[in-house]
A protein has these predicted regions:
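Extreme N-terminal signal-anchor transmembrane helix of membrane signaling/transducer proteins, especially
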Residues: 2-40, 44
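Short loop/turn microsegments at loop-to-beta-strand junctions
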Residues: 105, 199-200, 237-240
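Extracytoplasmic/periplasmic ligand-binding sensor regions of membrane-associated signaling proteins
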Residues: 141-226
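Extracytoplasmic/periplasmic ligand-binding sensor domains
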Residues: 117-141, 148-154, 182-183, 194-199, ...
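Juxtamembrane membrane-water interface segments immediately C-terminal to a transmembrane helix
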Residues: 32-69, 76, 84
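Acidic surface patches and DE-rich sequence motifs
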Residues: 111, 129, 189-190, 206, ...
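Extracytoplasmic/periplasmic sensory segments of membrane signal-transduction proteins
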Residues: 63-177, 228-232
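Solvent-exposed, extracytoplasmic
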Residues: 88-100, 214, 218-277
Length: 281
């Protein structure tokens, strides 16, 4: 879990790109053939390849951090200026912003305190878990490439236990409206469809500065892995491209058995430690 803080959207975005790209998501090429290349040419080729992938991931991070920040700011503004907010207004804001995203496949608003909402009598039943204990608006985008295709997902009983939500609730500071939380890659399942994803989120507060919920966005790593692992981008025979975090936990790897394992689990060579240190730095 990473938390990014700033005093402005511009600075936040800068921090997100520099820290998350460097620490959470970075390309590591761990083997290559240099039979017909000089060492310098090989390093240049690898550098260019890495930059291409970093730029691609940077664009995704740019969008998700900006989107999370913008919607959280709007929601916090609504709750700060009103004791009760129309649930239809909130739904419209979240759906419209979500539809503009090219990468997020899910968005959600979790509220532990629903007294800030008006007209709860007519609320969509999908927003309330079967046991009646959890309120969340969860939306799925079936076609991220174009507008439309947004559907509502029924809130599961255990949704409040989502790792991102738990981490934000446990670590958020009173009235902190600037921190964006980025979860580690993990298996997620909102509607009986398990996938590997990453969550972005921010805390939501009422007009007294009390934490009342989380707005979040989820990206599916499948599309990212298809781009990163596309064989047409191979520079050398036997090269390996990996997406991992600063603990060496692998999110993308051509060997599916290596997913969510550490680099040390699949590579006992001393070079693995050097790669993880490079990611941290």
């Amino acid at each position: 879990m990473f938390r990014l803080s700033s005093v402005s959207s511009k600075l936040l975005l800068s921090v997100a790109i520099s820290i998350i790209v460097a620490i959470a998501l970075i390309i590591a090429i761990v083997s290559f053939q240099v039979a017909s290349y000089s060492e310098k040419e090989a390093k240049n080729a690898i550098s260019l390849s890495s930059k291409r992938y970093v730029n691609y991931i940077q664009g995704i991070l740019n969008e998700e951090v900006t989107l999370t920040k913008a919607v959280a700011t709007s929601l916090n503004g609504m709750f700060q200026n009103n004791d009760h907010v129309d649930i239809n207004l909130i739904e419209s804001l979240i759906k419209n912003a979500f539809d503009s995203s090219h990468y997020a496949v899910y968005t959600f608003l979790y509220l532990k305190d629903t007294t800030v909402l008006s007209d709860m009598q007519n609320v969509d039943k999908k927003y309330i878990s079967p046991d009646g204990k959890t309120f969340s608006m969860i939306f799925f985008d079936q076609i991220t490439e174009k507008s439309g295709g947004i559907t509502t997902i029924s809130t599961p009983n255990n949704f409040s236990q989502l790792n991102l939500i738990q981490n934000i609730e446990q670590n958020v500071k009173y009235g902190d409206k600037d921190s964006v939380f980025v979860d580690s890659p993990r298996k997620l399942n909102y509607d009986n469809n398990e996938f590997l994803g990453i969550n972005f989120g921010m805390p939501i507060f009422n007009n007294k500065g009390k934490f009342i919920g989380v707005i979040g966005y989820t990206i599916d790593l499948l599309k990212i892995s298809e781009i990163i692992l596309d064989p047409k981008f191979d520079f050398f025979e036997g090269n390996t491209r990996i997406l991992m975090n600063d603990q060496g936990i692998i999110a993308v790897h051509e060997n599916k058995n290596g997913i969510l394992k550490t680099l040390f689990d699949i590579n006992k060579d001393q070079s693995a430690q050097l790669i993880v240190e490079a990611v941290k730095n």
